[in-house]
Amino acid sequence: MKTRYSVLSVAMTAAFYTQYAQADLREQCLLGVPHFQGEEVTGDQTMMPIEIEADNAVINQPKDATYTGDVAIKQGNRSLFADEVRVEQNGEQERRAFLKGSYRYQDNLIQAHGRDAAMDLGSETAELQNTEFQLVGRQGRGTAESGSFNHNKRILKNATFTACLPNDNAWSIEGNEMIQHIDEEYAEIWHARFKVLGMPVFYSPYLQFPIGDRRRSGLLIPNFHRSSKDGFAYSQPFYWNIAPNMDATITPTYYSRRGWQISPEYRYLTKLGEGIVAGEYIGKDRLDEYRPDDNDRKRYLMHWRHNMSFLTGWRLYVDYTKVSDKRYFSDFDSEYGSSTDGYATQQFKLGYYQPNYNLSISGKKFQTFDELDVGPYRVLPQIDFNYYNDELVKGGDFKLFAQTARFENDSKLMPKAWRFHVEPTLNFPLANRYGSLNFETKLYATHYLQEKGSSKQADDMDKNVTRIIPQVKVDLQTVLEADKQLFKGFNQTFEPRVQYVYRPYKDQSNIGSGLNQSVSFGYDSALLQSDYFSLFNDRRYSGLDRISSANLITAGGTNRFFNEKTGVEVFNFSIGQTYYLSPSKIDDLSQNSTTKRSSSWALESNWKFHRKWNWHGAYQYDTRLNQTSLANTSLQYKPSQDKLVQLSYRFASKDYINQNLRSNTYGQDIKQVGAVVGWELTDRVAFMASHYHDIALKKPVESQLSVNYNTCCWSANVYVARKLTATPIGSPDTINDLYYDNKFGVNFELRFGTNYSSGVRKMLKKGMIPYTEQYGIN
């Protein structure tokens, strides 16, 4: 059954809400808790003088004294109020106070009241009976039949605890014994019963929970959802605070149609660096449509991200993600990847950095999710060297880049290769108040040692290939300020830029194999996506295996408007085009060369016409195809961090996709509209709704609706979603055959006075197409 979610209907419900209060939720919650009055005293409380006030006193010096009628005792931060107090003293060290009837006790950390108590004035301990307590300056209250308090620990018998405000019994924890560790800011409870609205719903022989800002180990709140593909799913995360600099979360999840999944995540910050190690594992996926004829039904994900700086100038970076199969991110939601990425990256880089040079060794591999006969190359090792010297030539800046790389492919049809590259550059910059002129010369010198693929059907290769290509570039930029205001109140500048690049032609068809042109040319080159800023790039292709000839002039300019009072930029508009004095090509094939004398027109603009409104637009017109090739625009209203509305449109022509991907299974234009609303309706209620629709297919891509309800001590999130998913095995897979996964879920969160967020930011991160901001003016 197809489910539709109306963003408009959700937004209209906001009209029925009024502002809950002027103060935010945190301020409202803290209004309901007591705060310490007066100046907080530091030091040993037992050594401070004792002040006693009472209506009546019977003193039997030096042994005891009895005080009655509005008795008040103060020592340091501690205050005690009672109907009757008897103080006994045995020498200078032992002083005890016994309270009869009702009492109130308070210090800088806790307030308590009840009947009958005893307090040792020389050791900061107190014995309380039938007490009710409330933490000072933060949420947290409870009761106990008896309690023993000292300077760093509270031991409570038959106790209860809740972070809810007075008169709110949404949830509570009861136990036979509770120990509150004051310095460590956590509580332990034995034979714990968790209650919701007074009804017991969960039992644990032992439980820990925070009573401060420090993180503590223990069970986190479970969440569940239902999916048309997975069935019912239940997750129970466990948090392990291993040390101040490392922790872990272990989350077992049960899918009614798939089985059990275990997801550990370990985070660390040590002298050896900081990072995260995570995994997701299902021993046997029971879903019938997944590999029905394959006994290997394991599904897993491995992720490691690491950053390290050590010794002097050394850095290590690791980003490794591997999944069991191409469909993994289509079947499972994971924060370590998405099906829209198209691939998972496995890479590392070890580098040594100095002010005028750096040296690094790295490796990279891509795990693609598309069905490709030949995948991308893996690179190991890749050694890069960069050297900078602005004194080698008078008036010139010298730069040298050198690289050695080894390429291998999983396909036996594909060649292997070593690539040796040297790239010296000499730049002569001239600049004054009128603008800048850069004259640059560069030389690309590359040598390949190629090995034919091991398959008999592999193409023959030139074993040794040497390519030397010189380059000359002249770049002129200036900033012109208008004498008169075109629009009142706004100053205007125009920034023209002209660039000339020359590179001679070199046939590079003998570098690599043409079998993998669906993903790259040669070993690691691909046609770069074009926009206004890319017009001024030196090259059309990434990597080093394809360097097209160039005899071209690129001209463009940016018009900017600034508020004359604040100097803040409010509008810009850029337009540019490349003019080919001769065709740009990489080999003798006509499809790999330019046939027109000019490139696409590229336009880009940003407009912040109000502090709450942003608009962005980009447009490209392909003069070769005589059609619009790319276009996108978005409009956003954002009055605050937790309130925004964004409308967007994206377009890519079929011919442009064919030109860049070469294996375009989509077969038609991409025309996609989207709308995202994230809104804090009140301090307690927030929602997020999003919808993306493909106009060309006339079908939805993804729809989401999520509502968050927040209180001082708990929050709940309810969401529904419908998104495109991978084609089930054995099902038709044409352009009109789309398959969806429908989800419904509920998440709860207990709040112990440390989190008051509306949940809008978190909700916006959900989904196959996450919310992004692409505005050039903030």
UniProtKB/Swiss-Prot annotation:
Gene that specifies this protein: lptD
Keywords, sorted A to Z: Cell outer membrane, Membrane, Signal
GO biological process: Gram-negative-bacterium-type cell outer membrane assembly; lipopolysaccharide transport
Top-level taxon of origin: Bacteria
Family the UniProt entry places it in: Belongs to the LptD family.
Pfam family, one: LptD
Originating organism: Actinobacillus pleuropneumoniae serotype 5b (strain L20)
HAMAP family given in the database record: LPS_assembly_LptD
Name of the protein in question: LPS-assembly protein LptD
Subcellular location: Cell outer membrane
